[in-house]
Amino acid sequence: SNTDNPGDYYLVNLNQGTVKLLFQRSPWLDRDKLAKAIPVKYMSRDGMEIPALLTLTKKKTDKNYFIVMPHGGPNTKQYIGYDSWAQFFVSRGVNVLQPDFRGSTGNGTAHYVAGNMQWGKTMQADISDGVLWAIENGYADEDRVCIAGASYGGYATMAGLVFTPELYRCGINAIGVTDMQQLLNDYSKKASILSSWDKEPLLEWGDMSTEKGRAYAEETSPLLYVDNIVAPLLVLQGSNDPIVEAYHAEDLISELKAKGKTYEAMFQQYEEHCVTYCGEKATLEYLEIQEDFINKYLKN
């Protein structure tokens, strides 16, 4: 597999020196229409180098439509491999940037620990700087930029919309954290039940038992800053999600309604923590509503 190929399976006979194609993953996809991701790097505002994958649409479009897609985790990385969600957007005429903002893995210790207690802060600035880099280099039109992500990427979507509303024309928050205070409280309760606490979340997210941790959670909870949102928002949520529980989306929608914001939402009753590798019906419904959303708000 590769960034432009979901996977081919071969039988290799070393004795005969032959290679035989057995089958293709997702054979209905035209490989010629899939786009290869390009590894790029850009500098953040404080001088940190940020690796990213840039995937450019093969479609001819009247504008440079653009989506920045922060990955989940956040303590993971943007792997070089086939990404059906990115390819979906690219096939619709949208360029996609997937940055390894600070706090991502695979880029050295300094890059990783620089993300400690930086949700919504320098981690978000790295994403914003990726957007500015794309605009400067002609991959994005400044008035045609959307942000989309799942899990931590959903949090980053919300942080982008509330802390840098001027950057984005729309946003897609899939299974994303919106309430940092509640997230940290939930993990504290789970830890006390198990009589243990993983030190890594304390370092990364903060400690709600301290004044500093409580202040950090308040500063970085998108739910508290819904007033700042000016772009239309799509919220996708699995009702049975055990990782980012549905109250994150439900409380967000209540605030969006109360503040008169433009939004759409889809809850999948039987799904958990997923957006592209859910059940077939749910995955297709998620993709259909996203296509309608970007046609309505990114392209019009």
Task: Annotate each predicted stretch with a short phrase.
Residues 3, 44-46, 164-165:
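Short loop/turn positions at the edges of beta-strands in beta-sheet-rich folds
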Residues 101-300:
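Active-site-proximal cap/loop segments of hydrolase catalytic domains
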Residues 14-17:
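Short loop/turn segments that connect beta-strands within beta-propeller blades
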Residues 11-12, 42:
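Hydrophobic beta-strand positions
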Residues 2-3, 151:
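Residue-level signature of beta-propeller blades and closely related beta-rich strand-turn architectures
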Residues 4-11:
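Structural motif
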